[in-house]
Amino acid sequence: MITGQQIVKARKAKGMTQAKLANLIGVSTETVSKWEKGTFAPSLENEKKLYSVLGITHVSVNIRDARLFHERNMSAFLKGVFNSGQFPEAAKALSFAKSKHEGQLRKPRELEIPYINHPLTLACHALAMGLEEDTLLAALLLHDVCEDCGVAPANLPVSQEVQEIVALVTKPKPFLSESRYYAAIVENPKASLVKCIDRCNNLSGMAMGFSIEQIQDYIEETEKYYPKLLRVVKEQPEYNNAAWLLSYQIRSLLNTAKRITS
């Protein structure tokens, strides 16, 4: 989210008054003043207008440098965990995912966040929940490789179990049936868990890359399919605690998103 200091700095760099910026965004001068003071934050739509009017490259540098979960740090952490020798699948998956996602960026691409940040976050999230399972971590790291990098599941350098999980969460092209896609995932508890962890991260970042309409569609899809996925995860004794945490996290993110977009 853009901060008041970033707005002030970018506005002054362009030689704009608060009144001129307000006119370009379509709000009052008082509103711009409150944004800059941090009294309240701009809406998602106005934030996107600010990025466009003020110059996204200038503003994004501050956001990117201030990221809490930097891929360099997460990668180093995961390598340290995997070096124990107890995670041979995940170690291979980490190297393969970094290679295949190289050069790809997360949305919005103006922020220049490497795509690998996403699967790394998922693996770290799993470990933070106590899920120290080699095949699960490997599947989390590889979950987007087939869909986004054109790699067939059979060509992934991991076991058949991991290949099958990744195949289940990979959306086919053309994507014809949402209900059929989720019906297949729900038959596999580990694939259901991968999808829930993935959705948790995507929900947390959707405000930066989605329009209001896309956010509303994403909320609707999540509320329609994810309760069943979470029930499947919860039915596995070893995943019970993770299911509770993910349910809490997803519900909290949905409630916040619905409040903002209502």
Regions found by a protein language model. Name each.
Residues M1-I2:
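A detector for short, charged/polar N-terminal pre-domain segments
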Residues Q5-K20, L24:
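Short basic helix-loop element that most often maps to the first helix and adjoining turn
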Residues Q6, T17, S43-N46, A152:
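Residues that mark the N-terminal boundary/hinge immediately upstream of a DNA-recognition element
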Residues V8, S33-K34, S43, K48, ...:
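Key DNA-contacting residues within the recognition helix of helix-turn-helix
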Residues M16-L21, L50, L54, L142:
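Generic leucine side-chain signal with a strong bias for well-ordered alpha-helical environments
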Residues G26, S43-I63:
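DNA major-groove recognition helix of helix-turn-helix/homeodomain DNA-binding modules
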Residues G26-P42:
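Recognition helix of helix-turn-helix/homeodomain-like DNA-binding domains
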Residues N62-S262:
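Active-site helical microenvironments for divalent-metal-assisted chemistry
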